[in-house]
């Protein structure tokens, strides 16, 4: 059985149709079944990524259902010692927008309009493996995130000893 903390990898270009449907990469669907014995997953707003100044990139994060249930349990049990204001913000921005999903037989999933709007998903998008989750970005946003990451990479690699 694969390591449940390191199952999603790679970058996969895709598109979204006029009805808001996209195909989850086959590798990701297979990983859900192999590692979690469950095809269900949860889609929510990703943590915004700073692009410098007051600009932020918005995307979506997708978690296996069992991993999401653990995240939600820990957040609501306040294991992080959050203030009530922080916990309310986490609920509004991360927990409450979450939607349980299941791909159809063709691997398609409907991204809810509110999440599509949040992430600016219109046509071209990227699925990006992030070990225990995967993210969904519009092509333009992902290009900006990559540009920012390239600028930060030398310092980030040095910080972890490379």
UniProtKB/Swiss-Prot annotation:
Which CDD domains does the record cross-reference, listed alphabetically?
Answer: MraZ_C, MraZ_N
Q: Which UniProt keywords apply?
A: Cytoplasm, DNA-binding, Repeat, Transcription, Transcription regulation
Identify the stretch annotated as signal peptide in this record.
none
Keyword Transmembrane tagged = no
Question: Domain of life of the organism in this record?
Answer: Bacteria
Q: Name one Pfam family in it.
A: MraZ
Classify the main location.
cytoplasm
Entry GO MF terms: DNA-binding transcription factor activity; transcription cis-regulatory region binding
In this protein, which residues make up the domain named SpoVT-AbrB?
11-62, 98-141
**Gene3D superfamilies on file:** Transcriptional regulator MraZ domain
Q: Which NCBIfam families match?
A: PRK00326.3-4
HAMAP family in UniProt = MraZ (MF_01008)
**Quaternary structure and partners:** Forms oligomers.
What protein does this entry describe? Transcriptional regulator MraZ
